[in-house]
């Protein structure tokens, strides 16, 4: 499977047993569709035939500018993690 695309690399906390998947909790806004698209992209990226990985995800408030910026950064981090897992890093 080809790696997902991302524009930056960031360090991530290690897997935690408390979370089962990375999700974007956005609903009922124009940004909700963006959140859904991000979730679908990550789900597609993570469907490679490898064991499931437990990841911690941030709590995000998409109704603020800072929250939207954090959501985009978290999405890039998740893509980086997905790429690393697909490459076996």
From Swiss-Prot:
Q: Which GO terms describe its biological process?
A: killing of cells of another organism
The reply on keyword Lipoprotein is yes
Instruction: Please classify the protein's predominant subcellular localization into one broad category.
Output: host cell
Q: Where is this region: Disordered?
A: 1-21
GO CC annotation? host cell plasma membrane; membrane
Coiled-coil regions, chain positions: none
Which residues does UniProt assign to the signal peptide?
A: 1-47
- What topology in the membrane does the UniProt record assign? Lipid-anchor
Protein keywords: Cytolysis, Host cell lysis by virus, Host cell outer membrane, Host membrane, Lipoprotein, Membrane, Signal, Viral release from host cell
Does the entry feature the keyword Membrane, yes or no?
yes
Q: Where does this polypeptide localize?
A: Host cell outer membrane
Bias category Polar residues: which stretches?
1-10
Complex formation: Interacts (via C-terminus) with the spanin inner membrane subunit (via C-terminus). Part of the spanin complex which spans the entire periplasmic space. The spanin complex is composed of spanin inner membrane subunit and spanin outer membrane subunit.
Q: Any idea what job this protein has?
A: Component of the spanin complex that disrupts the host outer membrane and participates in cell lysis during virus exit. The spanin complex conducts the final step in host lysis by disrupting the outer membrane after holin and endolysin action have permeabilized the inner membrane and degraded the host peptidoglycans. Host outer membrane disruption is possibly due to local fusion between the inner and outer membrane performed by the spanin complex.
Under which name does UniProt file this protein?
A: Probable spanin, outer lipoprotein subunit
Organism from which the protein derives: Pseudomonas phage phiKMV
């Amino acid at each position: 499977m080809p790696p997902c695309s991302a524009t930056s690399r960031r360090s991530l906390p290690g897997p935690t047993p408390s979370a089962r998947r990375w999700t974007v909790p956005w609903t009922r806004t124009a940004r909700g569709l963006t959140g859904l698209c991000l979730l679908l992209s990550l789900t597609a990226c993570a469907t490679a035939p490898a064991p499931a990985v437990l990841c911690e995800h941030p709590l995000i408030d998409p109704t603020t500018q800072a929250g939207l910026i954090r959501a985009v950064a978290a999405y890039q981090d998740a893509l980086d993690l997905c790429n690393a897992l697909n490459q076996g890093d």
